[in-house]
């Protein structure tokens, strides 16, 4: 039916199914032409409303449209725990609505939550590939739980220190005996390195999910590491070498740390080499006393430069040169006098001042009276302006 025929049928009020079937089989170009042939705004609005309410077209044959299947949600660890331990013998006589709270209490204190997370992830991976019908959950747990030494439903309450009782209302309750030895023991393989792929490989070896094909190009998304419990084991692990195969992130971090350590070592070594070079150069400039040990070289990876350093040459000159007996930079103030009241002018030469000081009357060169063991009656030197008592 062409567009003109469709417009003519609209005038005779055709059935809704016929209109929908016509609109579903139109192409985009035909729909544009159809809107151009309907000039009235009310008719265009009615056609637009009909297009919005159309059901999706179901195509047959090789042109059939198939919507992409959404990824299924992974099985929750608690749900897996509940599915396995709902068969505890003490719970069989009670409906599920009265057991939900009890199983929740068991889950809160269960020591094997990490193992349940691994098991449910492994089963979810199998289910997503081969389907739920070919991967029964109860069969999966019946294979993997005994392998991981998980407590069986028949012995779970006794192993973990739980006891079941009936309250006044006739409902089941559980109580935990924290003082019992079994309450403090984790039943799972806490000392085993385990991954999702390890679990899948084991159940497949037991004949479960034989059609499942693991992707060899991807690593396991979840890994349960080894639990170190003894001091000797901790010391052995501390001295162990780095694993040959490490994640890409760990390899990048290790390489970055090595580069930083190398830069720090080069920096420290360079400063030490420069300091040793300066010390050796100082020894070269001033060999020291005869017989004093002087190393030929210092253990340093850097080459030593034996050229004299001006700073140390000047420093050695300051300490080795005699102290001069002149004051070229000293200036006398006007009207200055010596101790014996001898006037001194700021124009007097320094050489003349040395003579004045040497020939001053107060200057005494005989100090025999002050030597050790001198006569106590010795005559002290006299001064012109001071009378001896």
UniProtKB/Swiss-Prot annotation:
Quote the subcellular location field of this record: Nucleus
Q: What is its main location?
A: nucleus
- Known PROSITE patterns for this protein? ALPHA_BOX
Could you list this entry's UniProt keywords, alphabetically sorted.
Answer: DNA-binding, Nucleus, Transcription, Transcription regulation
User: Which residue windows are coiled coil?
Assistant: none
Q: Which GO terms describe its molecular function?
A: DNA binding, bending
Q: Which residues bind DNA?
A: 70-127
Q: Name the GO cellular-component terms.
A: nucleus
Would I find Ribosomal protein among this entry's keywords? no
One Gene Ontology term from the biological process aspect of the record: positive regulation of mating-type specific transcription, DNA-templated
* Listed InterPro entries: MATalpha_HMGbox
What's the superkingdom here? Eukaryota
Asked if the Swiss-Prot or TrEMBL record annotates the protein with the keyword Transcription regulation, the reply is: yes
Function comment: Mating type proteins are sequence specific DNA-binding proteins that act as master switches in fungal differentiation by controlling gene expression in a cell type-specific fashion. Transcriptional activator that induces the transcription of alpha-specific genes.
Query: What family does this belong to?
Result: Belongs to the MATALPHA1 family.
- What is the recorded name of this protein? Mating-type protein MAT-1
